[in-house]
């Protein structure tokens, strides 16, 4: 599954698996580097997903506050 089609939860699960593999002392240096690189890409993708979600939540809160303010001004 590519990172473009993975959900946030799937990316986090893959990150956890990568950490477990990296903790295994039998992993070769080359494989460790590959795992680290993949982990960094997943971490960046998760960060972007979280920032986008945070922006959406903040936008919704702002929109709701504006609606409440408009409702209050029409009541007066």
From Swiss-Prot:
The keyword Hydrolase applies. One of its GO terms (biological process) is DNA catabolic process. Pfam families: Exonuc_VII_S. It catalyses: Exonucleolytic cleavage in either 5'- to 3'- or 3'- to 5'-direction to yield nucleoside 5'-phosphates. Bidirectionally degrades single-stranded DNA into large acid-insoluble oligonucleotides, which are then degraded further into small acid-soluble oligonucleotides. HAMAP family: Exonuc_7_S. Belongs to the XseB family. This is Exodeoxyribonuclease 7 small subunit. It comes from Staphylococcus aureus (strain NCTC 8325 / PS 47).
């Amino acid at each position: 599954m590519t990172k473009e089609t993975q959900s946030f939860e799937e990316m986090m699960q893959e990150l956890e698996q990568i950490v477990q593999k990296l903790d295994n002392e039998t992993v070769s240096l080359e494989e460790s580097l590959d795992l680290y690189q993949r982990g960094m890409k997943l971490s960046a993708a998760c960060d972007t997903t979280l920032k986008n979600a945070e922006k959406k939540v903040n936008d919704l809160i702002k929109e709701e506050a504006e609606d409440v303010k408009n409702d209050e001004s029409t009541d007066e």
